[in-house]
C-alpha cells in the first residue's frame, strides 16, 4: 500500500465500490434483525452546511455500527421539498420553485455522496413530487370522511409579509419564525385536523418512549397541557345580542370568591357584538389583533383593557361584577373568558392595579405567614379566607366543595382541558400540496374522488410575489363533478403534513398505495431517529399524531413512530451558531477538498458528545487529519514488516499481553460507547489511546509480536469504520481481507485477553504510601503480606518498630501498622 494517506484517491475508490455494489440498498429479510436508522430529512436549500454534516454523520455512524453487528439496516434519505423559501428564492432568481428545488436536490445529493453517507438512494422521496403528495391527499380525504378533518372560520396568526397563516408554534416572540415580521390576527376559513381527539393518547404514550430525551417529552407534555378544572357559567345582568351569559374555565375554583371582574378576549362574540355600537371598543379590538399571542410575550407585555359597561353575575353569590375586554386573554384557550382574581393571579393583579379595580384576598398561606398584596399577587395554593362557608378549606377540599355547589345549581361542572388546539393545515401559498377538496357553488365542500387524485400542482409557473399562481389561474381552479361546475380549493397544506409521514413512505416508496402494510410493519417503528431539539414540539408531535391516524386506518401496527431519539447539538463558530448573516460559516466542500470527507466526519464526531453544541476550530480539524495520517502510517509500516500469523496465546511475553489487553479493553469500551451510550467522542478517544499504545509498545521481532500488533491495528480499523469509512475500507483491504469492512463482523472481546497475570498493589506504613508492588493476580492475603514485608522501601520505614497489625485488602493494598 501507499505509505502516504491520500484522501481524495482513497475516498473516490471507496465511493465507487459502494455505488457499483449497491452497498446500501436493502430489502425486507425476516431472517435478520432489522434496524431502521433515520436522520430528519433536509430542506433542499441549495448547499449543505455543517449542521447537516453533523446530523447525517451521527445517523451514518449508528447505521454502519448496527450493520457490522449483523443487522438488516435501513438508512434512507429524501427531501422536505415544499415550503415558502422556494417561493422566495424563485422570485429572487426569476425562476419557478420546482426548477429551483430540483436543481438543489441534485446538487445536495452529490454533496451527501461525497461525504460517504451510506444512504439507500433507491428509496429517495421528494415531497413535492406527485407520487408522494398523491397519498397525502388521499389520506386527507379519508380523514374528512371520518370527521377528523373540517373547515371553519378561524382567527389565525397572519404574517403580512409572507401573506400566510402561521401555527401558534411558528410565532416566536410575536414575530414570524421565518421573516421576523410582526404577526397579526385575522379571520379566514381554514382546514383543521382534529389532533385534540388524540390529545389523551399523545400524552399517555409519552410513557412508552423511555429512549427519548426527558426534555423533549416534557416540552410535549406542556404543549398538550392537560389540566383538571371547573367550567362555570357567568350570566349577564342583561342579555347582549341574544346572548345571556358566557362560560369560564379555571384550574383554581378555590379562588372563585375573590373574583372582582371578568375579562373577555378581544375576539369573544360578546366583545364583537358590543363593538358594533362602541367605537372605542372596536378600536381596542383592532389593536389586539396585531399583538403577539405567544405565551412568553403575553406574560411580559403591558396589560391593557377596556370596561364594556356591562355586568355579569357571580355564579355563587349572584353579586354583579364588571365585564372587561383585555389584551391578555386568548380566545383559543378555555372559552375566551377568564374570571379575574387579582389577589391570586399576577396578570389580573397587574391589570387591577392599572385600572384601580378591587383586589380581594381569599387565599392565605398554610403556615399562617403574612402576604403583601400591594407588591404582588399571592399565587400559591393555601387556605381559604373571606370565602364564607368555604373558609379554612385547603385547595383540594375547596375544589371539591365549590365544584359541587356549582354543579348543584346547574352553574358548572368539573372538566378536563387541554392547551393543545386542533391543527390548522391550510396555507395561502402556492408551493405546497393542493388540498384535495372541491368547493361547491352553494358554499358546500366535497373531497376530490380517489380516482381523480393527485390534484396536480402546476410546476411551470411565474411567481409575481403577490398572489399564488394557482389562485390567479382561473382555468386551474375550474373543475367539474357529476356534470356540475365546481372549483378546486386553492389553499395548500402546511408543509408539516409532508414531514409527518415521510419516515413511513421510505418503507415502500414505490407502493401504489399510501404504504405497503407488510413492508411498513417489517421496518417500523424507526429504531433510531436523529434531529434537532427545535423540532421537539411541532414535527415530533405531528409525526406521532399522524402515525396514530395511519394505525387507525390499518396501515401500520405499532403505536409510536420513533423508538429512540437523539437530538444533536448545534455547530458553533466563535461561540455563536453558524449562519450566513453572521459570516461565521464553514463550507464543507472546501474542507473535503483540503482534508477529505473522513477528516470532516472524524472532527464532527470527536469535538463534542452528540447532544452538546460543537465549537468549530481549525486546529481541531488539523488534529483529526494528523490522526488519520498516523493511523495510515502505522498500518503501512506494519505491513512492510512482514506477514503476521496466528497469535499463540500461551507464549506471549508481558509486553505482548499488555497490548492484547489494551486492544480488547478498547473493543469493549468502544462497543458500549457506540451502542448504549452513543458518545462517539469517547469511542474515538479510546482508539487514539490504543494507537498510541501500538506505536509505543509494538514488537515486530517475533511472529507473536507481529500477530499481536496486527490484531490491534485490525481492531482499530474496524472500530473506526463507522466514523471514517473510506480510510478503513482501504486499510481493511490492505490487510488482505476479502470482505469489505462495511460487511465485516464487529470485533468481539476475548475475555481471556483481559485477564491480568500480575496486579499492582499499594504498600502503606501507618496509612502512608511507601511502595507500589507487582504481585500475582491470584495472590492471597498471606502472599501479599509477604511481598510487602520483603520490599526495601517498606522495610526502611518499619526498621526498629514493632508491627502491631497488617491490614490486607486483596487486589488493592497492604497497610502495616507499626510503632
Swiss-Prot record:
Keywords: Aminoacyl-tRNA synthetase, ATP-binding, Cytoplasm, Ligase, Nucleotide-binding, Protein biosynthesis. The keyword Protein biosynthesis applies. Belongs to the class-I aminoacyl-tRNA synthetase family. Its EC number is 6.1.1.4. InterPro entries: aa-tRNA-synth_I_CS (IPR001412), aa-tRNA-synth_Ia (IPR002300), Leu-tRNA-ligase (IPR002302), Leu_tRNA-synth_edit (IPR025709), M/V/L/I-tRNA-synth_anticd-bd (IPR013155), Methionyl/Leucyl_tRNA_Synth (IPR015413), Rossmann-like_a/b/a_fold (IPR014729), tRNAsynth_Ia_anticodon-bd (IPR009080). It is found in: Cytoplasm. NCBIfam families: leuS_bact. A motif ('KMSKS' region) lies at residues 577-581. It catalyses: tRNA(Leu) + L-leucine + ATP = L-leucyl-tRNA(Leu) + AMP + diphosphate. GO terms for molecular function: aminoacyl-tRNA deacylase activity; ATP binding; leucine-tRNA ligase activity. Pfam families: Anticodon_1, tRNA-synt_1, tRNA-synt_1_2, tRNA-synt_1g. ATP binds at residue 580. This is Leucine--tRNA ligase. The keyword Nucleotide-binding applies. A motif ('HIGH' region) lies at residues 42-52. It comes from Saccharophagus degradans (strain 2-40 / ATCC 43961 / DSM 17024). CDD domains: Anticodon_Ia_Leu_BEm, LeuRS_core. One of its GO terms (cellular component) is cytosol. Its main location: cytoplasm. GO terms for biological process: leucyl-tRNA aminoacylation. It is an enzyme of class 6 (ligase).
